[in-house]
Amino acid sequence: RRRTNRILNPGLLTATALVLLALLWWVGATVFTDVRLSQATRHGAASTALDDARAAVLQARSNESLVLVARGGGRTSDAGYTARLDRVLGPGGLLDTASAAAGPAGALAIDEVRAAALGWRDAHGQLRALDDGGRYPDAVASAIGTDPAGSRAAFERLDTALGRALDEQRAALDRSAGAARSALTGLAAGPTVLALLAAAAAAAGIAIRVREYG
């Protein structure tokens, strides 16, 4: 029987390397996808909390207006304002939820929302002091006028800050989800192509070995 000194078969070595590369690709793409999906989930949670905060702020703005319309009979509406702002600003409230979900990258925008909400709450307190002190026209001017220190201006700053924070989180959500989709596409195609190439290389290697012993 004819002997050969060939020890390493290039085809089989190539097939082995391709299989290992396919495995590494699959593991890497899976980990990357999991990370991106986790990020997308967090940004989605932050967006939801900020959406809820914006809705609560709009309801509080309506409560503020109703108090002025009631002229002395708006205790219920003012309590509604306080309850809604507490839901936004209070411990474990919507801004805390959004901040925890967004992480350090979204902290600045959410801190700006918090500062604006505190500013509006202070402006509302001044509006109530004007109304309770018999200065109803001044209270109305604060609610609907253009004074930068008034309640309307403070509310608009808050609404703008909420809009910026929401846009930031939605954009981050889209980026993370898009990256996850791309990774899944690569996960489906890459290892499959490498496996086919490995099979072809293995077949070529076996054919060489068969000829050697033929």
Please give the residue ranges for each predicted region.
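Juxtamembrane amphipathic/hinge helix adjacent to a transmembrane helix
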Residues: 1, 156-179
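Juxtamembrane interface at the cytosolic side of transmembrane helices
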Residues: 1-18, 192-214
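Polytopic transmembrane helical bundles with strong interfacial aromatic enrichment
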Residues: 20, 24, 125, 157, ...
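N-terminal membrane-insertion alpha helix
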Residues: 25-43
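N-terminal extracytoplasmic segments of bacterial inner-membrane proteins
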Residues: 38-75, 115-132
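Alpha-helical segments in soluble extracytoplasmic regions
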Residues: 63-118
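Polar/charged, Q/E/K-enriched amphipathic alpha-helical segments with strong coiled-coil propensity
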Residues: 102-159, 174-177
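N-terminal membrane-entry
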Residues: 179-197
